[in-house]
Amino acid sequence: MNIVGQMKEQLKEEIRQAVGKAGLVAAEELPEVLLEVPREKAHGDYSTNIAMQLARIAKKPPRAIAEAIVEKFDAERVSVARIEVAGPGFINFYMDNRYLTAVVPAILQAGQAYGESNVGKGEKVQVEFVSANPTGNLHLGHARGAAVGDSLSNILAKAGFDVTREYYINDAGKQIYNLAKSVEARYFQALGTDMPLPEDGYYGDDIVEIGKKLADEYGDRFVHVDEEERLAFFREYGLRYELDKIKNDLAAFRVPFDVWYSETSLYESGKIDEALSTLRERGYIYEQDGATWFRSTAFGDDKDRVLIKQDGTYTYLLPDIAYHQDKLRRGFTKLINVWGADHHGYIPRMKAAIAALGYDPEALEVEIIQMVNLYQNGERVKMSKRTGKAVTMRELMEEVGVDAVRYFFAMRSGDTHLDFDMDLAVAQSNENPVYYVQYAHARVSSILRQAKEHQLSYEGDVDLHHLVETEKEIELLKALGDFPDVVAEAALKRMPHRVTAYAFDLASALHSFYNAEKVLDLDQIEKTKARLALVKAVQITLQNALALIGVSAPEQM
Protein backbone atom coordinates (compact mmCIF):
# COMPACT_ATOMS: atom_id res chain seq x y z
CA MET A 1 0.00 0.00 0.00
CA ASN A 2 1.34 3.44 -0.96
CA ILE A 3 0.55 5.46 2.19
CA VAL A 4 2.30 8.66 1.14
CA GLY A 5 0.94 8.49 -2.40
CA GLN A 6 -2.61 8.03 -1.10
CA MET A 7 -2.18 10.94 1.30
CA LYS A 8 -0.97 13.20 -1.54
CA GLU A 9 -4.00 12.26 -3.65
CA GLN A 10 -6.32 12.95 -0.69
CA LEU A 11 -4.61 16.31 -0.16
CA LYS A 12 -5.08 17.22 -3.85
CA GLU A 13 -8.74 16.15 -3.70
CA GLU A 14 -9.34 18.26 -0.60
CA ILE A 15 -7.78 21.26 -2.39
CA ARG A 16 -10.14 20.67 -5.33
CA GLN A 17 -13.08 20.44 -2.93
CA ALA A 18 -12.05 23.70 -1.22
CA VAL A 19 -11.81 25.49 -4.59
CA GLY A 20 -15.34 24.31 -5.36
CA LYS A 21 -16.72 25.31 -1.95
CA ALA A 22 -15.15 28.76 -2.32
CA GLY A 23 -16.90 29.16 -5.69
CA LEU A 24 -13.69 30.26 -7.39
CA VAL A 25 -14.02 28.43 -10.74
CA ALA A 26 -16.16 25.74 -12.31
CA ALA A 27 -14.90 22.18 -11.85
CA GLU A 28 -14.12 21.78 -15.57
CA GLU A 29 -11.90 24.90 -15.49
CA LEU A 30 -9.79 23.67 -12.60
CA PRO A 31 -6.20 22.85 -13.72
CA GLU A 32 -4.24 19.92 -12.34
CA VAL A 33 -3.35 20.43 -8.69
CA LEU A 34 0.42 20.15 -8.25
CA LEU A 35 2.16 19.47 -4.94
CA GLU A 36 5.84 20.14 -4.36
CA VAL A 37 8.14 19.48 -1.41
CA PRO A 38 9.56 22.89 -0.38
CA ARG A 39 13.34 23.18 -0.34
CA GLU A 40 13.23 24.71 3.12
CA LYS A 41 11.56 22.72 5.90
CA ALA A 42 10.26 25.97 7.41
CA HIS A 43 7.91 26.22 4.42
CA GLY A 44 6.06 23.02 5.32
CA ASP A 45 5.91 19.45 4.06
CA TYR A 46 4.06 20.25 0.83
CA SER A 47 3.26 23.38 -1.13
CA THR A 48 0.93 24.20 -4.04
CA ASN A 49 0.79 27.10 -6.48
CA ILE A 50 -2.86 26.44 -7.42
CA ALA A 51 -3.84 30.00 -6.42
CA MET A 52 -1.43 31.46 -9.00
CA GLN A 53 -2.77 29.05 -11.62
CA LEU A 54 -6.35 30.16 -10.90
CA ALA A 55 -5.69 33.93 -10.82
CA ARG A 56 -6.32 34.51 -14.52
CA ILE A 57 -9.45 32.33 -14.64
CA ALA A 58 -10.96 33.61 -11.36
CA LYS A 59 -9.88 37.21 -12.08
CA LYS A 60 -8.71 37.67 -8.48
CA PRO A 61 -5.32 38.24 -6.82
CA PRO A 62 -3.53 34.92 -6.12
CA ARG A 63 -3.19 35.65 -2.41
CA ALA A 64 -6.93 36.31 -2.05
CA ILE A 65 -7.62 33.02 -3.86
CA ALA A 66 -5.18 31.18 -1.57
CA GLU A 67 -6.88 32.59 1.54
CA ALA A 68 -10.31 31.57 0.20
CA ILE A 69 -9.06 28.01 -0.40
CA VAL A 70 -7.55 27.79 3.08
CA GLU A 71 -10.82 29.00 4.65
CA LYS A 72 -12.78 26.15 3.02
CA PHE A 73 -10.07 23.49 3.45
CA ASP A 74 -10.96 20.62 5.84
CA ALA A 75 -7.57 19.98 7.47
CA GLU A 76 -8.72 17.19 9.77
CA ARG A 77 -9.73 14.94 6.86
CA VAL A 78 -6.19 14.79 5.48
CA SER A 79 -3.88 14.84 8.52
CA VAL A 80 -2.89 18.49 8.07
CA ALA A 81 -1.76 20.16 11.30
CA ARG A 82 -1.36 23.69 9.95
CA ILE A 83 -1.79 25.67 6.70
CA GLU A 84 -0.14 28.94 5.75
CA VAL A 85 -0.43 31.31 2.81
CA ALA A 86 3.04 32.50 1.81
CA GLY A 87 4.51 35.03 -0.61
CA PRO A 88 2.39 35.88 -3.66
CA GLY A 89 -0.06 33.04 -2.99
CA PHE A 90 1.67 29.74 -2.22
CA ILE A 91 -0.25 27.47 0.14
CA ASN A 92 2.05 25.55 2.50
CA PHE A 93 0.83 22.44 4.32
CA TYR A 94 2.36 21.24 7.58
CA MET A 95 1.34 17.62 8.09
CA ASP A 96 0.32 15.82 11.26
CA ASN A 97 3.10 13.26 10.92
CA ARG A 98 1.23 10.54 12.79
CA TYR A 99 -0.17 9.41 9.44
CA LEU A 100 3.38 8.33 8.49
CA THR A 101 3.39 5.54 11.08
CA ALA A 102 1.10 3.53 8.76
CA VAL A 103 4.04 3.27 6.32
CA VAL A 104 5.88 0.79 8.56
CA PRO A 105 3.22 -1.97 8.84
CA ALA A 106 2.47 -1.53 5.13
CA ILE A 107 6.12 -2.30 4.30
CA LEU A 108 6.35 -5.19 6.77
CA GLN A 109 3.23 -6.74 5.29
CA ALA A 110 4.23 -6.21 1.64
CA GLY A 111 7.84 -7.41 2.00
CA GLN A 112 9.44 -7.93 -1.43
CA ALA A 113 6.28 -6.56 -3.06
CA TYR A 114 6.76 -3.12 -1.47
CA GLY A 115 7.15 -0.55 -4.24
CA GLU A 116 4.92 -2.40 -6.70
CA SER A 117 2.17 -0.48 -8.49
CA ASN A 118 -0.11 -0.80 -11.48
CA VAL A 119 0.82 2.39 -13.32
CA GLY A 120 1.85 0.22 -16.27
CA LYS A 121 -1.61 -1.39 -16.41
CA GLY A 122 -0.14 -4.54 -17.95
CA GLU A 123 1.03 -2.75 -21.12
CA LYS A 124 3.22 -5.05 -23.24
CA VAL A 125 6.68 -3.51 -23.40
CA GLN A 126 9.75 -4.94 -25.05
CA VAL A 127 13.18 -3.78 -23.92
CA GLU A 128 15.91 -4.70 -26.40
CA PHE A 129 19.40 -4.07 -25.09
CA VAL A 130 23.07 -5.04 -25.37
CA SER A 131 22.57 -6.86 -28.73
CA ALA A 132 26.36 -6.84 -29.27
CA ASN A 133 27.74 -8.54 -32.36
CA PRO A 134 28.82 -12.10 -31.40
CA THR A 135 32.32 -11.44 -32.73
CA GLY A 136 34.24 -10.51 -29.58
CA ASN A 137 34.16 -9.48 -25.94
CA LEU A 138 31.57 -7.21 -24.37
CA HIS A 139 33.12 -3.79 -23.77
CA LEU A 140 32.29 -1.03 -21.30
CA GLY A 141 29.58 0.51 -23.49
CA HIS A 142 27.84 -2.88 -23.62
CA ALA A 143 28.20 -3.17 -19.84
CA ARG A 144 26.60 0.21 -19.24
CA GLY A 145 23.80 -0.61 -21.69
CA ALA A 146 23.28 -3.94 -19.89
CA ALA A 147 23.07 -2.24 -16.49
CA VAL A 148 20.66 0.45 -17.71
CA GLY A 149 18.53 -1.97 -19.76
CA ASP A 150 18.20 -4.54 -16.99
CA SER A 151 17.50 -1.92 -14.29
CA LEU A 152 14.87 -0.28 -16.49
CA SER A 153 13.26 -3.68 -17.19
CA ASN A 154 13.13 -4.47 -13.46
CA ILE A 155 11.60 -1.08 -12.68
CA LEU A 156 9.00 -1.33 -15.46
CA ALA A 157 7.96 -4.78 -14.22
CA LYS A 158 7.73 -3.48 -10.63
CA ALA A 159 5.45 -0.69 -11.88
CA GLY A 160 3.00 -3.08 -13.54
CA PHE A 161 4.25 -3.29 -17.14
CA ASP A 162 4.37 -6.65 -18.92
CA VAL A 163 8.07 -6.65 -19.83
CA THR A 164 10.02 -8.83 -22.27
CA ARG A 165 13.82 -8.50 -22.28
CA GLU A 166 15.30 -9.26 -25.67
CA TYR A 167 18.78 -9.65 -27.17
CA TYR A 168 19.02 -9.34 -30.96
CA ILE A 169 21.77 -11.63 -32.24
CA ASN A 170 23.48 -10.13 -35.29
CA ASP A 171 24.31 -13.55 -36.74
CA ALA A 172 23.93 -12.64 -40.43
CA GLY A 173 25.77 -10.28 -42.72
CA LYS A 174 29.36 -9.45 -43.52
CA GLN A 175 30.62 -9.36 -39.93
CA ILE A 176 29.77 -13.04 -39.49
CA TYR A 177 31.52 -13.94 -42.76
CA ASN A 178 34.55 -12.04 -41.43
CA LEU A 179 34.28 -13.98 -38.17
CA ALA A 180 34.38 -17.28 -40.08
CA LYS A 181 37.36 -16.10 -42.17
CA SER A 182 39.18 -14.92 -39.03
CA VAL A 183 38.59 -18.28 -37.31
CA GLU A 184 39.83 -20.02 -40.47
CA ALA A 185 43.09 -18.01 -40.40
CA ARG A 186 43.67 -18.73 -36.69
CA TYR A 187 42.88 -22.43 -37.27
CA PHE A 188 45.49 -22.74 -39.99
CA GLN A 189 47.98 -20.76 -37.89
CA ALA A 190 47.37 -23.14 -34.96
CA LEU A 191 48.28 -26.00 -37.30
CA GLY A 192 51.52 -24.23 -38.25
CA THR A 193 50.36 -22.96 -41.64
CA ASP A 194 50.71 -19.26 -42.35
CA MET A 195 47.39 -17.68 -43.35
CA PRO A 196 46.80 -13.91 -43.06
CA LEU A 197 43.70 -12.55 -41.35
CA PRO A 198 41.16 -10.92 -43.68
CA GLU A 199 41.36 -7.14 -44.06
CA ASP A 200 38.22 -6.62 -41.93
CA GLY A 201 39.02 -9.56 -39.66
CA TYR A 202 38.87 -9.89 -35.89
CA TYR A 203 42.18 -9.75 -34.05
CA GLY A 204 41.06 -10.59 -30.52
CA ASP A 205 42.61 -13.26 -28.32
CA ASP A 206 39.25 -15.05 -28.33
CA ILE A 207 39.61 -15.76 -32.07
CA VAL A 208 43.10 -17.18 -31.45
CA GLU A 209 41.56 -19.38 -28.74
CA ILE A 210 38.82 -20.61 -31.11
CA GLY A 211 41.45 -21.51 -33.73
CA LYS A 212 43.45 -23.49 -31.14
CA LYS A 213 40.35 -25.31 -29.89
CA LEU A 214 39.43 -26.32 -33.44
CA ALA A 215 42.96 -27.55 -34.10
CA ASP A 216 43.00 -29.52 -30.82
CA GLU A 217 39.54 -30.98 -31.40
CA TYR A 218 39.64 -31.75 -35.11
CA GLY A 219 43.31 -31.75 -36.10
CA ASP A 220 43.78 -31.10 -39.83
CA ARG A 221 40.33 -32.41 -40.75
CA PHE A 222 39.18 -29.04 -42.17
CA VAL A 223 42.32 -28.51 -44.24
CA HIS A 224 41.07 -31.03 -46.75
CA VAL A 225 37.39 -30.03 -47.06
CA ASP A 226 35.76 -27.59 -49.46
CA GLU A 227 36.19 -23.95 -48.36
CA GLU A 228 32.42 -23.32 -48.32
CA GLU A 229 31.85 -26.30 -46.03
CA ARG A 230 34.78 -25.28 -43.82
CA LEU A 231 33.59 -21.68 -43.45
CA ALA A 232 30.01 -22.81 -42.72
CA PHE A 233 31.28 -24.97 -39.86
CA PHE A 234 33.65 -22.29 -38.56
CA ARG A 235 30.81 -19.76 -38.69
CA GLU A 236 28.60 -21.90 -36.45
CA TYR A 237 31.46 -22.92 -34.16
CA GLY A 238 32.68 -19.34 -33.77
CA LEU A 239 29.17 -18.00 -33.24
CA ARG A 240 28.41 -20.59 -30.57
CA TYR A 241 31.71 -19.90 -28.79
CA GLU A 242 31.25 -16.12 -28.80
CA LEU A 243 27.56 -16.27 -27.87
CA ASP A 244 28.21 -18.66 -24.98
CA LYS A 245 30.88 -16.27 -23.71
CA ILE A 246 28.48 -13.32 -23.96
CA LYS A 247 25.75 -15.28 -22.16
CA ASN A 248 28.15 -16.29 -19.38
CA ASP A 249 29.38 -12.71 -18.93
CA LEU A 250 25.83 -11.35 -18.80
CA ALA A 251 24.79 -14.04 -16.30
CA ALA A 252 27.74 -13.06 -14.10
CA PHE A 253 26.57 -9.45 -14.45
CA ARG A 254 23.07 -10.53 -13.25
CA VAL A 255 21.40 -9.67 -16.55
CA PRO A 256 18.81 -12.21 -17.75
CA PHE A 257 17.04 -12.23 -21.13
CA ASP A 258 13.66 -13.72 -22.01
CA VAL A 259 14.34 -13.90 -25.75
CA TRP A 260 17.51 -14.35 -27.82
CA TYR A 261 16.34 -13.35 -31.29
CA SER A 262 18.40 -14.48 -34.29
CA GLU A 263 18.78 -12.14 -37.28
CA THR A 264 19.22 -15.24 -39.46
CA SER A 265 15.68 -16.33 -38.53
CA LEU A 266 14.35 -13.20 -40.29
CA TYR A 267 15.86 -14.46 -43.55
CA GLU A 268 14.79 -18.07 -43.05
CA SER A 269 11.18 -17.20 -42.15
CA GLY A 270 10.67 -14.80 -45.06
CA LYS A 271 10.02 -11.87 -42.71
CA ILE A 272 12.44 -9.61 -44.57
CA ASP A 273 10.56 -10.17 -47.84
CA GLU A 274 7.27 -9.53 -45.99
CA ALA A 275 8.50 -6.19 -44.64
CA LEU A 276 9.73 -5.15 -48.09
CA SER A 277 6.38 -6.13 -49.62
CA THR A 278 4.49 -4.11 -46.99
CA LEU A 279 6.56 -1.01 -47.72
CA ARG A 280 6.16 -1.53 -51.47
CA GLU A 281 2.37 -1.96 -51.22
CA ARG A 282 2.15 1.23 -49.16
CA GLY A 283 4.10 3.17 -51.80
CA TYR A 284 7.35 3.80 -49.95
CA ILE A 285 9.74 1.77 -52.13
CA TYR A 286 11.31 2.83 -55.43
CA GLU A 287 14.16 1.70 -57.68
CA GLN A 288 16.96 4.06 -58.67
CA ASP A 289 20.53 3.58 -59.98
CA GLY A 290 20.13 -0.20 -59.73
CA ALA A 291 19.33 -0.03 -56.00
CA THR A 292 16.10 -0.34 -53.98
CA TRP A 293 15.29 2.73 -51.88
CA PHE A 294 13.01 3.46 -48.91
CA ARG A 295 11.25 6.83 -49.15
CA SER A 296 11.98 7.74 -45.51
CA THR A 297 11.86 11.49 -46.27
CA ALA A 298 8.06 11.11 -46.36
CA PHE A 299 8.30 10.77 -42.56
CA GLY A 300 10.82 13.48 -41.75
CA ASP A 301 14.12 11.68 -42.36
CA ASP A 302 16.77 13.94 -43.91
CA LYS A 303 17.27 11.66 -46.94
CA ASP A 304 15.91 8.46 -48.46
CA ARG A 305 17.68 5.23 -47.53
CA VAL A 306 19.02 2.34 -49.61
CA LEU A 307 17.61 -1.05 -48.59
CA ILE A 308 19.09 -3.25 -51.33
CA LYS A 309 22.40 -2.26 -52.90
CA GLN A 310 23.31 -2.53 -56.59
CA ASP A 311 25.01 -5.89 -55.98
CA GLY A 312 21.80 -7.30 -54.46
CA THR A 313 23.03 -7.34 -50.86
CA TYR A 314 20.91 -5.86 -48.07
CA THR A 315 21.87 -2.83 -46.01
CA TYR A 316 21.58 -3.11 -42.21
CA LEU A 317 18.33 -1.16 -42.35
CA LEU A 318 16.22 -3.77 -44.16
CA PRO A 319 16.54 -6.62 -41.61
CA ASP A 320 16.15 -4.02 -38.84
CA ILE A 321 12.84 -2.91 -40.39
CA ALA A 322 11.69 -6.53 -40.60
CA TYR A 323 12.73 -7.10 -36.98
CA HIS A 324 10.73 -4.10 -35.74
CA GLN A 325 7.71 -5.15 -37.78
CA ASP A 326 7.94 -8.55 -36.08
CA LYS A 327 8.16 -6.89 -32.66
CA LEU A 328 4.96 -4.95 -33.31
CA ARG A 329 3.21 -8.02 -34.70
CA ARG A 330 4.02 -9.81 -31.44
CA GLY A 331 1.73 -7.34 -29.69
CA PHE A 332 4.19 -4.99 -28.03
CA THR A 333 2.78 -1.47 -27.82
CA LYS A 334 6.06 0.05 -26.68
CA LEU A 335 9.49 -0.84 -28.05
CA ILE A 336 12.35 0.45 -25.91
CA ASN A 337 15.74 0.10 -27.62
CA VAL A 338 18.89 0.75 -25.61
CA TRP A 339 21.46 1.89 -28.17
CA GLY A 340 24.99 3.24 -28.12
CA ALA A 341 25.57 6.91 -28.87
CA ASP A 342 26.85 6.02 -32.36
CA HIS A 343 23.27 4.97 -33.25
CA HIS A 344 21.76 8.40 -32.56
CA GLY A 345 21.38 9.20 -36.26
CA TYR A 346 19.63 5.87 -36.82
CA ILE A 347 16.56 6.88 -34.79
CA PRO A 348 14.74 9.04 -37.43
CA ARG A 349 14.98 6.34 -40.11
CA MET A 350 13.70 3.62 -37.75
CA LYS A 351 10.76 5.81 -36.71
CA ALA A 352 10.12 6.53 -40.40
CA ALA A 353 10.10 2.79 -41.12
CA ILE A 354 7.62 2.08 -38.32
CA ALA A 355 5.32 4.83 -39.63
CA ALA A 356 5.67 3.52 -43.20
CA LEU A 357 4.66 0.04 -42.02
CA GLY A 358 1.44 1.57 -40.67
CA TYR A 359 2.27 1.78 -36.97
CA ASP A 360 2.61 4.71 -34.57
CA PRO A 361 6.26 5.82 -34.70
CA GLU A 362 5.95 6.86 -31.04
CA ALA A 363 5.81 3.14 -30.22
CA LEU A 364 9.60 3.23 -30.58
CA GLU A 365 11.61 4.78 -27.76
CA VAL A 366 15.39 4.86 -27.82
CA GLU A 367 17.53 5.18 -24.70
CA ILE A 368 20.98 6.37 -25.74
CA ILE A 369 24.03 5.13 -23.83
CA GLN A 370 27.05 7.43 -23.81
CA MET A 371 30.73 6.60 -23.44
CA VAL A 372 32.41 5.39 -20.26
CA ASN A 373 35.87 6.65 -19.26
CA LEU A 374 37.79 4.60 -16.70
CA TYR A 375 40.11 6.29 -14.21
CA GLN A 376 42.64 4.75 -11.82
CA ASN A 377 45.20 6.57 -9.66
CA GLY A 378 43.84 9.81 -11.10
CA GLU A 379 44.72 8.84 -14.67
CA ARG A 380 42.53 7.68 -17.51
CA VAL A 381 42.78 3.95 -18.23
CA LYS A 382 42.71 3.43 -21.99
CA MET A 383 44.00 -0.12 -22.18
CA SER A 384 43.96 -3.22 -20.01
CA LYS A 385 47.26 -3.77 -18.18
CA ARG A 386 46.80 -7.50 -18.64
CA THR A 387 46.00 -7.67 -22.36
CA GLY A 388 47.14 -4.30 -23.69
CA LYS A 389 43.73 -3.96 -25.34
CA ALA A 390 40.44 -2.26 -24.48
CA VAL A 391 39.14 -3.14 -21.00
CA THR A 392 36.30 -5.65 -21.21
CA MET A 393 33.16 -5.95 -19.13
CA ARG A 394 34.51 -9.18 -17.63
CA GLU A 395 37.77 -7.49 -16.58
CA LEU A 396 35.96 -4.58 -14.94
CA MET A 397 33.69 -6.98 -13.01
CA GLU A 398 36.74 -8.91 -11.79
CA GLU A 399 38.61 -5.72 -10.89
CA VAL A 400 35.96 -3.87 -8.84
CA GLY A 401 33.08 -6.37 -8.39
CA VAL A 402 29.65 -6.70 -9.95
CA ASP A 403 27.91 -4.59 -7.28
CA ALA A 404 30.14 -1.56 -7.89
CA VAL A 405 29.84 -1.79 -11.68
CA ARG A 406 26.04 -2.19 -11.58
CA TYR A 407 25.62 0.67 -9.09
CA PHE A 408 27.97 3.12 -10.83
CA PHE A 409 26.43 2.42 -14.25
CA ALA A 410 22.92 2.97 -12.85
CA MET A 411 23.93 6.13 -10.98
CA ARG A 412 23.58 8.59 -13.88
CA SER A 413 21.30 8.98 -16.88
CA GLY A 414 22.58 6.75 -19.69
CA ASP A 415 22.64 9.76 -22.01
CA THR A 416 25.45 11.45 -20.05
CA HIS A 417 29.16 10.68 -20.29
CA LEU A 418 30.38 8.71 -17.28
CA ASP A 419 33.78 8.90 -15.61
CA PHE A 420 34.21 5.65 -13.67
CA ASP A 421 36.68 6.00 -10.79
CA MET A 422 37.95 2.46 -10.16
CA ASP A 423 39.68 3.46 -6.91
CA LEU A 424 36.48 4.97 -5.54
CA ALA A 425 34.48 1.90 -6.59
CA VAL A 426 36.53 -0.38 -4.30
CA ALA A 427 37.03 2.09 -1.43
CA GLN A 428 35.55 0.97 1.89
CA SER A 429 34.51 4.46 2.90
CA ASN A 430 31.45 6.69 2.88
CA GLU A 431 32.82 8.45 -0.21
CA ASN A 432 32.05 5.28 -2.18
CA PRO A 433 28.27 5.45 -2.83
CA VAL A 434 27.73 1.71 -3.25
CA TYR A 435 29.63 0.99 -0.02
CA TYR A 436 27.62 3.73 1.74
CA VAL A 437 24.28 2.23 0.66
CA GLN A 438 25.25 -1.40 1.29
CA TYR A 439 26.65 -0.45 4.70
CA ALA A 440 23.25 0.99 5.63
CA HIS A 441 21.71 -2.42 4.92
CA ALA A 442 24.45 -4.22 6.86
CA ARG A 443 23.93 -1.78 9.74
CA VAL A 444 20.18 -2.44 10.08
CA SER A 445 20.81 -6.18 9.72
CA SER A 446 23.29 -5.96 12.61
CA ILE A 447 20.75 -4.06 14.74
CA LEU A 448 18.13 -6.74 14.10
CA ARG A 449 20.61 -9.51 15.04
CA GLN A 450 21.45 -7.72 18.30
CA ALA A 451 17.75 -7.33 19.06
CA LYS A 452 17.25 -11.06 18.59
CA GLU A 453 20.05 -11.74 21.08
CA HIS A 454 18.14 -9.58 23.61
CA GLN A 455 14.90 -11.38 22.65
CA LEU A 456 13.40 -8.13 21.42
CA SER A 457 10.98 -8.16 18.48
CA TYR A 458 9.21 -5.64 16.27
CA GLU A 459 6.34 -8.12 15.79
CA GLY A 460 3.09 -8.15 17.73
CA ASP A 461 1.42 -5.18 19.40
CA VAL A 462 3.81 -2.24 18.90
CA ASP A 463 2.92 1.42 19.51
CA LEU A 464 4.32 3.08 16.39
CA HIS A 465 3.41 6.59 17.54
CA HIS A 466 6.81 6.60 19.25
CA LEU A 467 8.24 7.03 15.74
CA VAL A 468 7.14 10.63 15.28
CA GLU A 469 8.91 12.00 18.35
CA THR A 470 12.15 13.05 16.62
CA GLU A 471 12.99 14.80 13.35
CA LYS A 472 15.32 11.97 12.22
CA GLU A 473 12.57 9.36 12.60
CA ILE A 474 10.11 11.51 10.65
CA GLU A 475 12.65 12.01 7.84
CA LEU A 476 13.23 8.27 7.67
CA LEU A 477 9.48 7.55 7.58
CA LYS A 478 9.00 10.07 4.77
CA ALA A 479 11.84 8.51 2.78
CA LEU A 480 10.34 5.04 3.22
CA GLY A 481 6.93 6.27 2.13
CA ASP A 482 8.32 7.81 -1.06
CA PHE A 483 9.57 4.51 -2.54
CA PRO A 484 6.46 3.44 -4.52
CA ASP A 485 6.18 6.88 -6.14
CA VAL A 486 9.90 6.87 -6.99
CA VAL A 487 9.58 3.49 -8.72
CA ALA A 488 6.47 4.60 -10.63
CA GLU A 489 8.16 7.83 -11.75
CA ALA A 490 11.35 5.99 -12.74
CA ALA A 491 9.26 3.61 -14.86
CA LEU A 492 7.12 6.25 -16.56
CA LYS A 493 10.05 8.57 -17.26
CA ARG A 494 12.48 5.71 -18.10
CA MET A 495 14.90 6.94 -15.43
CA PRO A 496 16.47 4.01 -13.55
CA HIS A 497 19.00 6.38 -11.96
CA ARG A 498 16.11 7.78 -9.87
CA VAL A 499 16.04 4.48 -7.95
CA THR A 500 19.81 4.59 -7.42
CA ALA A 501 19.53 8.14 -6.08
CA TYR A 502 16.64 7.04 -3.84
CA ALA A 503 18.69 4.17 -2.36
CA PHE A 504 21.46 6.64 -1.51
CA ASP A 505 19.00 9.10 0.08
CA LEU A 506 17.36 6.34 2.15
CA ALA A 507 20.79 5.13 3.30
CA SER A 508 21.68 8.71 4.23
CA ALA A 509 18.46 9.07 6.27
CA LEU A 510 19.21 5.77 8.04
CA HIS A 511 22.81 6.70 8.91
CA SER A 512 21.63 10.11 10.14
CA PHE A 513 18.95 8.49 12.33
CA TYR A 514 21.41 5.90 13.68
CA ASN A 515 23.98 8.55 14.61
CA ALA A 516 21.38 10.71 16.38
CA GLU A 517 19.18 8.16 18.16
CA LYS A 518 19.66 5.05 20.28
CA VAL A 519 17.80 2.19 18.61
CA LEU A 520 18.30 -0.54 21.23
CA ASP A 521 17.40 1.02 24.58
CA LEU A 522 16.65 -1.64 27.19
CA ASP A 523 15.23 1.05 29.48
CA GLN A 524 12.57 2.01 26.91
CA ILE A 525 11.29 -1.30 25.54
CA GLU A 526 8.19 0.06 23.76
CA LYS A 527 10.16 2.75 21.94
CA THR A 528 12.82 0.15 21.06
CA LYS A 529 10.19 -2.17 19.56
CA ALA A 530 8.84 0.68 17.44
CA ARG A 531 12.33 1.56 16.22
CA LEU A 532 13.05 -2.10 15.42
CA ALA A 533 9.95 -2.12 13.22
CA LEU A 534 11.29 1.04 11.56
CA VAL A 535 14.74 -0.41 10.81
CA LYS A 536 13.15 -3.64 9.54
CA ALA A 537 11.13 -1.49 7.12
CA VAL A 538 14.39 0.18 6.05
CA GLN A 539 15.99 -3.23 5.49
CA ILE A 540 13.12 -4.39 3.26
CA THR A 541 13.03 -1.16 1.27
CA LEU A 542 16.80 -1.05 0.72
CA GLN A 543 16.73 -4.68 -0.46
CA ASN A 544 13.92 -3.88 -2.89
CA ALA A 545 15.61 -0.75 -4.24
CA LEU A 546 18.99 -2.44 -4.70
CA ALA A 547 17.37 -5.48 -6.35
CA LEU A 548 15.90 -3.19 -9.03
CA ILE A 549 19.38 -2.03 -10.05
CA GLY A 550 20.99 -5.47 -9.74
CA VAL A 551 23.01 -4.79 -6.57
CA SER A 552 23.22 -7.17 -3.60
CA ALA A 553 22.23 -6.22 -0.05
CA PRO A 554 24.86 -7.78 2.27
CA GLU A 555 23.97 -8.47 5.90
CA GLN A 556 27.57 -8.09 7.04
CA MET A 557 30.47 -5.96 5.77
From Swiss-Prot:
GO terms for molecular function: arginine-tRNA ligase activity; ATP binding. Transmembrane segments: none annotated. GO terms for cellular component: cytoplasm. Keywords: Aminoacyl-tRNA synthetase, ATP-binding, Cytoplasm, Ligase, Nucleotide-binding, Protein biosynthesis. GO terms for biological process: arginyl-tRNA aminoacylation. Its EC number is 6.1.1.19. A motif ('HIGH' region) lies at residues 132-142. It catalyses: tRNA(Arg) + L-arginine + ATP = L-arginyl-tRNA(Arg) + AMP + diphosphate. Its main location: cytoplasm. SMART domains: Arg_tRNA_synt_N, DALR_1. SUPFAM superfamilies: Anticodon-binding domain of a subclass of class I aminoacyl-tRNA synthetases, Arginyl-tRNA synthetase (ArgRS), N-terminal 'additional' domain, Nucleotidylyl transferase. It comes from the Bacteria. It is an enzyme of class 6 (ligase). Coiled coil: none annotated. It is found in: Cytoplasm. Monomer. Belongs to the class-I aminoacyl-tRNA synthetase family. This is Arginine--tRNA ligase. It comes from Geobacillus thermodenitrificans (strain NG80-2). The gene is argS.
